[in-house]
Amino acid sequence: FIGDSRTVGLYEYGQIGEADVFADNGMSLFNLWSSKTACGGERKTLEQLLGENSYQTIHFMLGINELGYSMEEIVKQYGEAVEKIQEMQSQARIVLGANLHVTGEQSAESDIYNNQRINELNGKIEEIGREKGCYYFDVNEKFDGESGSLSEEYSVDGSHVLGKYYADWLSWLQEKG
């Protein structure tokens, strides 16, 4: 699993088990290759982790922290990251995860971190997945309300699900394959 604070939530509350997790609060495409996170008790870069291990499946979910950049730059960085992961783990099935929506209130309060931009980015991520032969899963179908926003019953801060729902998220991923 590679990702940001939402992936940290999956790790801390989702009962991932023995899976390696390269995630941190604030992780982005722009610091992905220079960051180190604790994996297996040792702080490593993503390049070290991918170089030392062989994975069957890699879940990749980044993008929300990048929304302050131009969509063109985000898509460029995203595509390059996927290509590098594919080069280093050619046998792995790569699953690109849509970015979780924010609540309607959170979306209305921001010109940058809103569901319109998240949907635009998710569409671009889905395109990258098609172009590069990756799978794409959109967890918003699990947590959105009728308005197409993260349902407030699942969130306190407007952008993350409550800890007790990360296990549901992981189960949903497992059901999707």
Where are the regions that the model predicts?
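A short helix->loop->beta-strand "cap" motif at the edges of active sites that frequently abuts
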Residues: 89-93
